């Protein structure tokens, strides 16, 4: 069974973490390569305009696989250098692949998002939570540190003070608190989660694919660039956008008072 599955619904892709018997825990050998391959395939498909990331079963992701951490022969054994290598070629490959998706990503958080699972949700651009979802970064309770980039992601999502509170206490928060803290955009009844995510993805997917990808790139660059650098990148992306048929279609649709039909040209 592959750790991730992809379902294509026209311009929308649903990426499902697929280890429900272990609450979609990650860290087995090969997980990084499987997620990277799935994300590379989506990036190469210009017909995909939006991705929904969710979990199979009752959890989004419980994070790292505790049973494998306890296994003396497992991937987290062998001392410092082998463990460092495992993180870089496996856990970090998962993180880099999801963070590097070119199109907008919606995390549909259907249950527990703990540790790495919470950080995976933060890699999405938009997060919608089921009212059954819960969030936490419990690394310290295992004698660990956030090893997947969470110390970079979470403060940028909810601010340094809230992130520090979650990291230093190991507390879990419910979906309502996550919404109050800005970790998720909205909370919806559990049974409507995927319908809500698909509705939002449909809105996004109706927009020009090139402009969507360029805008996501600008948002990502804006997290680390100066304002002058952001302006320079924006002018380049805008020059590309002005040359597209989709730009002309958007202008004409507005002048003609009709809905635009963007074809990715």
PLM-predicted stretches and their roles:
Residues 1-56:
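Conserved CoA-thioester-binding segment of acyl-CoA-metabolizing enzymes
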Residues 1-13, 46, 60, 170-176, ...:
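C-terminal alpha-helix plus adjacent terminal tail
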Residues 25-28, 62, 71, 141, ...:
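Phosphate-coordinating loops and pocket residues in cytosolic domains that bind phosphorylated ligands
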Residues 41, 96-210, 243-244, 249-252, ...:
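Crotonase-fold acyl-CoA enzyme core
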Residues 22, 55-97, 113, 143, ...:
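Glycine- (often His-adjacent) and acidic-residue-rich active-site loop
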Residues 15, 19, 34-35, 53, ...:
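Terminal peptide-recognition signature
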Residues 29-36, 85-88, 92, 191-194, ...:
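Non-membrane alpha-helical structural segments and their capping/turn regions in soluble enzymes
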């Amino acid at each position: 069974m592959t750790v991730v599955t992809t379902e294509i619904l026209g311009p929308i892709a649903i990426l499902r973490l697929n280890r429900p018997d272990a609450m979609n825990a990650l860290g087995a050998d090969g997980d990084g390569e499987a997620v990277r391959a799935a994300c590379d395939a989506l990036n190469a498909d210009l017909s995909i305009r939006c991705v929904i990331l969710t979990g199979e079963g009752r959890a989004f992701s419980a994070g790292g696989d505790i049973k494998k951490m306890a296994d003396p022969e497992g991937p987290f054994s062998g001392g410092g250098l082998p463990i460092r290598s495992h993180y870089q070629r496996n856990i970090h490959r998962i993180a880099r692949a999801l963070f590097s998706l070119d199109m907008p990503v919606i995390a549909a958080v259907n249950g527990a998002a703990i540790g790495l699972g919470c950080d995976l949700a933060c890699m999405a651009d938009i997060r919608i939570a089921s009212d059954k979802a819960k969030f936490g970064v419990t690394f310290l309770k295992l004698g660990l540190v956030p090893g997947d980039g969470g110390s970079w992601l979470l403060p940028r999502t909810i601010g340094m003070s809230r992130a520090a509170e979650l990291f230093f206490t190991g507390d879990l928060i419910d979906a309502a608190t996550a919404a109050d803290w800005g970790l998720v955009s909205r909370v919806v009844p559990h049974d409507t989660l995927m319908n809500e995510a698909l509705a939002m993805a449909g809105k996004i997917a109706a927009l020009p694919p090139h402009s969507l990808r360029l805008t996501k790139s600008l948002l990502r660059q804006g997290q680390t660039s100066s304002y002058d650098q952001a302006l320079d990148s924006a002018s380049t992306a805008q020059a590309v956008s002005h040359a597209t048929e989709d730009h002309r279609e958007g202008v004409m649709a507005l002048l003609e008072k009709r809905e635009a039909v963007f074809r990715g040209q």
